[in-house]
């Protein structure tokens, strides 16, 4: 029933298997590629374009379902939603690798779907997906003249060793994360992040990838020959020679004027690139006037003529479209700290390309939780790239970020990420947003420069300034020119888009896309060296504006402070059902994170809020101490007094004689359950805490003035007044350890003897307040009230992971 073709090879330390003829047999081409424990089903389907176009309508979609890692999707619907950024980036890698290899002028619609069936989290899925797409194209009958293969490359600098398709563990130690793709004769696409590697080390990685892909290319050819392609689609390029000749004779002057003076844009919007404007004008007029050519033929002819005109001008006159030399950078203007309430901002303008980059700092609670097929993780550095239509003078509705925006944002992220401080040194979550306000090429590299400037303006301690530059290529036969800092027309009409970002010490990100069938290593080497010169020039311009990160962050940046509490007190801080910690957050406006080891992180916009929250937490975790005043709440009424809950769950007794400085008939006459009170600790006997209300001002929480013992011949020793207050407190006067009578009210009453614990004096019948009570406290400050109210805690327990509130 199944006509199965299967080929395999030992590649690296794993077995690579390509198989077809069993699954998805209705597709033009379908293969299953296994590499280690990673498996991808790649399918290809083609059909004639519904409308005339002058480009290749190729769509590549990489899909990663949860079953590939043995999981059920979360959420209510329990199925996958829109593609993740990781899936989108892999789709772009495959697209950018195979697109240049199709014949010029081939405009059939092609859809390639790469479905991740299994993932062992060791073998990279992007490698398997590209090999699968190339193998499926090889047996589909679609014109695809040469196979392509790709590999992920790592590098251990200490060992000077490159790694083929590194595992996650190896990648964590690697100073390079590169994806390479190419044919037997040339390099087609490169994407990488690096820890300031040299140009020689990066070129070595590309060479290593090229050498190791050779056996995979042989395997694809062997597999295609064994499987036997379906009927090959005969592709005959359009004969557009006459159309090109007509365009040249009728409109060459307009194009020459447009490209000889880049600032002069005839018959077009002042913001539209000249070539694109002329194309629109010529296409419309020529189709109407001639009547013998289709719109697709005219568009292709115009593009062919335009390319030949510009390329000949560059190679013959050694001058570019805008008159610059090959290695000349456009004029650069830089401004920082221009958005008042942002945490940091920068405006980077290079020629007609401009990026407004703004930063915002947040707490660890603002980290992005990424739930992907690579595993769950938290991301503390976010970089978002936005490209509105007004940046190129077009009237179009704003839409959510597409593949291009996601890809450009990720490239800038790769460039900045290696120079960021560690979380231990700078615990903030960092978000950078790049708003492209003008674009004429290299907007992603303007984002890199603007992001570096904005982060330094924010106060993020970067290791070094980071700059990026886009290189271009014009190649005709053996003649070629490498162009620095390309503009939009040079990107559109050129053969290469080679973006390099890094510091003075090395490369942090590299991306190379080709529009021809690859280039040799000599051109790559020259491009890297020329890019280094341009990068250093741009960093010099940036350093003149801001060379180092600012000291500290702005006042309106969220504040973060930590404190350590006893692990056994965690449950007290959290409270029953989170009652206590929730009350602290609501009252002060802070966010609190509690770790299992007793570390408490407090986040707030203002320092005052942080201090207030710290005071409330200290109030909960502190142990009762004789002479200290605390806030509490009445939890129980008894005939002989009232029980008060304080310090997040501790209970103490206020004897009826310690409620007021006057006689009361019943406790319930003056107190009720849930009343908020201020109490003074006057005695501790093991776990029994004795409290007093009458000695504390119930409004301010301060000790009452003139509160002391005095001797009375008639009634014996009595409580009288003693001086006190913010300046400090003295010991209460000592007396015989017998019954005492207290003055005040309508007469004296017997007072029960109490133990003052270690704070008692003499015979132990008197209470003492330590001299330091009432003086400024290094934790609580002078404000004894703290505005805390009751703090109940009777459960919650420690947590295995940090708890966020």
From Swiss-Prot:
It is found in: Cytoplasm. Keywords: Cytoplasm, Magnesium, Metal-binding, Nucleotidyltransferase, RNA-binding, Transferase. GO terms for cellular component: cytosol. Its cofactor is Mg(2+). It catalyses: RNA(n+1) + phosphate = RNA(n) + a ribonucleoside 5'-diphosphate. Residues 558-617 form the KH domain. Residues 702-805 are annotated as: Disordered. Mg(2+) binds at residues 491, 497. PROSITE patterns: KH_TYPE_1 (PS50084), S1 (PS50126). Its EC number is 2.7.7.8. It holds the Pfam family S1. One of its GO terms (biological process) is mRNA catabolic process. Residues 627-694 form the S1 motif domain. InterPro entries: ExoRNase_PH_dom1 (IPR001247), ExoRNase_PH_dom2 (IPR015847), ExoRNase_PH_dom2_sf (IPR036345), KH_dom (IPR004087), KH_dom_type_1 (IPR004088), KH_dom_type_1_sf (IPR036612), NA-bd_OB-fold (IPR012340), PNPase (IPR012162). One of its GO terms (molecular function) is RNA binding. Its main location: cytoplasm. PANTHER family: POLYRIBONUCLEOTIDE NUCLEOTIDYLTRANSFERASE (PTHR11252), POLYRIBONUCLEOTIDE NUCLEOTIDYLTRANSFERASE 1, MITOCHONDRIAL (PTHR11252:SF0). Involved in mRNA degradation. Catalyzes the phosphorolysis of single-stranded polyribonucleotides processively in the 3'- to 5'-direction. Belongs to the polyribonucleotide nucleotidyltransferase family. This is Polyribonucleotide nucleotidyltransferase. It comes from Anaplasma marginale (strain Florida).
């Amino acid at each position: 029933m199944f006509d199965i073709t299967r080929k395999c090879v030992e590649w690296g330390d794993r077995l690579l298997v390509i198989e077809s003829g069993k699954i998805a047999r209705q597709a033009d081409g379908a293969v299953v590629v296994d590499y280690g424990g990673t498996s991808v089903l790649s399918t290809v389907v083609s059909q004639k374009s519904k409308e005339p176009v002058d480009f290749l309508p190729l769509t590549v979609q990489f899909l990663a379902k949860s079953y590939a890692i043995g999981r059920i999707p979360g959420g209510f619907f329990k199925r996958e939603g829109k593609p993740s950024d990781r899936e989108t980036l892999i789709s772009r890698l495959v697209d950018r690798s195979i697109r240049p290899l199709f014949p010029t002028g081939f405009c059939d619609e092609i859809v390639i779907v790469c479905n991740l069936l299994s993932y062992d989290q060791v073998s990279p899925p992007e490698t398997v997906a590209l090999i699968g797409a190339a193998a499926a194209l090889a047996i589909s009958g679609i014109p695809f003249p040469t196979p392509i293969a790709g590999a992920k490359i790592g590098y251990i600098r200490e060992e000077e060793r490159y790694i083929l398709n590194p595992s996650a563990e190896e990648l964590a130690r690697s100073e390079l994360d590169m994806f390479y793709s190419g044919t037997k004769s040339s390099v087609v696409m490169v994407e990488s992040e690096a820890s300031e590697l040299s140009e020689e080390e990066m070129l070595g990685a590309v060479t290593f990838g090229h050498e190791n892909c050779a056996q995979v290319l042989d395997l694809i050819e062997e597999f295609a020959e064994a499987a036997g392609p379906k009927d090959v689609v005969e592709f005959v390029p359009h004969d557009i020679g006459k159309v090109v000749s007509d365009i040249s004779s009728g409109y060459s002057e307009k194009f020459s004027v447009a490209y000889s003076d880049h600032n002069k844009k005839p018959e077009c919007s002042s913001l539209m690139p000249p070539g694109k404007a002329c194309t629109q004008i010529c296409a419309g007029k020529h189709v109407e006037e001639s009547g013998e050519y289709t719109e697709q033929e005219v568009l292709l002819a115009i593009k062919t003529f335009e390319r030949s005109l510009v390329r000949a001008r560059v190679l013959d006159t050694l001058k570019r479209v805008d008159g610059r030399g090959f290695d000349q950078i456009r004029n650069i203007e830089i401004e920082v700290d221009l958005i008042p309430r942002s945490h940091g901002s920068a405006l980077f303008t290079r020629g007609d390309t401009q990026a407004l980059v703004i930063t915002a700092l947040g707490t660890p609670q603002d980290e992005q939780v990424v739930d992907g097929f690579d595993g769950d993780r938290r991301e503390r550095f976010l970089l978002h790239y936005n490209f509105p239509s007004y940046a190129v003078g077009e009237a179009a509705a704003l839409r959510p970020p597409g593949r291009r925006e996601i890809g450009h944002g990720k490239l800038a992220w790769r460039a900045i990420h290696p120079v960021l401080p560690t979380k231990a040194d700078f615990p903030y979550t960092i978000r950078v947003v790049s708003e492209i306000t003008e674009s004429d090429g290299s907007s992603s590299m303007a984002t890199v420069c603007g992001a570096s400037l904005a982060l330094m303006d924010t106060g993020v301690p970067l290791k070094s300034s980071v700059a990026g530059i886009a290189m271009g290529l014009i190649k005709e036969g053996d003649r070629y020119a490498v162009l620095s800092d390309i503009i939009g027309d040079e990107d559109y009409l050129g053969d290469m888009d080679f973006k390099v970002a890094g510091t003075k010490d090395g490369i942090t990100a590299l991306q190379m896309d080709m529009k021809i069938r690859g280039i040799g290593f000599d051109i790559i080497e020259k491009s890297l060296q020329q890019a280094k010169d341009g990068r250093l020039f741009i960093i010099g311009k940036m350093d003149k504006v801001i060379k180092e990160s600012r000291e500290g962050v702005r006042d309106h940046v969220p504040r973060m402070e930590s404190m350590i509490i006893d692990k056994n007190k965690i449950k007290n801080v959290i409270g029953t059902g989170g009652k206590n910690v929730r009350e602290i957050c609501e009252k002060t406006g802070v966010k609190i994170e509690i770790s299992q080891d007793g570390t408490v992180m407090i986040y707030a916009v203002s320092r005052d809020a942080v201090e207030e929250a710290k005071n409330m937490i200290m109030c909960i975790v502190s142990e009762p101490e004789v002479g200290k005043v605390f806030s509490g709440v009445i939890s129980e009424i008894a005939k002989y007094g009232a029980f008060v809950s304080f310090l997040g769950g501790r209970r103490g007794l206020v004897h009826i004689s310690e409620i007021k400085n006057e006689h009361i008939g019943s406790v319930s006459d003056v107190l009720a359950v849930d009343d908020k009170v201020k109490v003074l600790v006057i005695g501790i006997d093991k776990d029994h805490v004795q409290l007093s209300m009458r000695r504390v001002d119930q409004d301010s929480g301060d000790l009452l003035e003139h509160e002391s013992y005095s001797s009375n011949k008639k009634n014996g020793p009595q409580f009288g007044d003693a001086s006190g207050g913010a300046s400090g407190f003295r010991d209460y006067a000592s007396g015989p350890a017998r019954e005492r009578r207290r003055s005040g009210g309508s007469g004296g009453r017997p007072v029960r003897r109490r133990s003052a614990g270690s704070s008692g004096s003499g015979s132990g019948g008197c209470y003492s307040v330590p001299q330091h009570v009432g003086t400024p406290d290094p934790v609580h400050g002078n404000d004894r009230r703290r505005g805390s109210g009751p703090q109940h805690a009777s459960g919650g327990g420690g947590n295995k992971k940090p708890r966020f509130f």
